[in-house]
Regions:
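Bacterial N-terminal signal peptides
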Residues: 8-21
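Hydrophobic, well-structured mid-protein blocks that either form specific transmembrane helices
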Residues: 101-145
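Acidic, serine/threonine-rich low-complexity disordered tracts
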Residues: 26-109, 149-241
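Positively charged n-region of N-terminal signal peptides that target proteins for export
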Residues: 1-6
């Protein structure tokens, strides 16, 4: 059960990104997204994602029986510039009473990332020199909403994960009919191939996404877990702020 619950957490922190040379911050409205996460018929978690022009926040936590077995809470905050690139990220998690917290600062002018662990023990900051531009996991997730998949059906992009520059592959497969709030919608079916590493924990390497074409947000996220099958994150509500 522990590993099943851990997998759903990463459905929210999916690392997919836009063409880094062409992307600009396309956020027109400030919104909050509410998701419920299921293992089969059982609801095991919830998530909230807040999207502002200068800051993104994702919160995820276990609920119900899953919370009693594996209590988990995580909050990821990323401050971004006018083009959507990360300037600073604060990542906090609490798992069965054990707290972890990290701060990451992106210095694009110097091709430098400052990485510091704050909890459970405060450690000395590290300077990591990598090629820019580069995204963290949350900012790349938000950026992915605005990709024109008819122009970019296959993309391989760099991400900052675990002190290194890694890559994610994203492939547009097909258009699908879907439903949200009792209305028929058009969705884009996308497959994402992720590094198994994450700033939070290990995750599934393949994730499927149904993206609402008109609202430009994920309607459904599905992570593949060998033997056990798939966990599903479902969009329940969009709130304009």
């Amino acid at each position: 059960m522990k590993y099943i619950i851990k997998l759903f957490i990463n459905l929210i922190f999916i690392s997919i990104s836009f063409n880094l040379l062409l992307f600009s911050n396309c956020i027109a409205n400030e919104i909050k997204l509410f998701y419920e996460i299921y293992y089969g018929p059982f609801k095991i978690g919830e998530s909230e994602i807040q999207i502002f022009s200068s800051k993104y926040t994702a919160i995820v936590y276990s609920v119900g029986l899953a919370k009693s077995i594996f209590p988990f809470y995580a909050k990821w905050e990323t401050w971004v510039d006018e083009k959507g690139y990360p300037k600073k990220a604060i990542i906090y998690s609490k798992e069965r009473g054990k707290e972890r917290k990290r701060a990451i600062y992106f210095k694009r002018e110097e091709n430098k990332i400052i990485y510091q662990k704050l909890l459970p023990n405060c450690e000395e900051a590290e300077n990591i020199f990598l090629e820019f531009p580069i995204y963290d996991e949350l900012s790349s997730f938000i950026a992915s909403f605005y990709i024109d998949y008819t122009i970019y059906p296959r993309i391989r992009l760099p991400l900052f994960i675990k002190k290194k520059r890694d890559y994610v592959k994203i492939e547009f497969r097909e258009r699908k009919n879907c439903e949200f709030e009792k209305e028929k919608k058009e969705c884009l079916y996308i497959e994402v191939y992720l590094p198994k590493k994450s700033e939070l924990l290990e995750r599934a390497s393949e994730v499927e996404i149904l993206l609402l074409k008109d609202k430009k947000v994920p309607l459904e996220l599905r992570g593949k877990l060998p033997i056990f099958g798939s966990l599903v994150g479902k969009l329940k509500k969009i709130e304009n702020l």
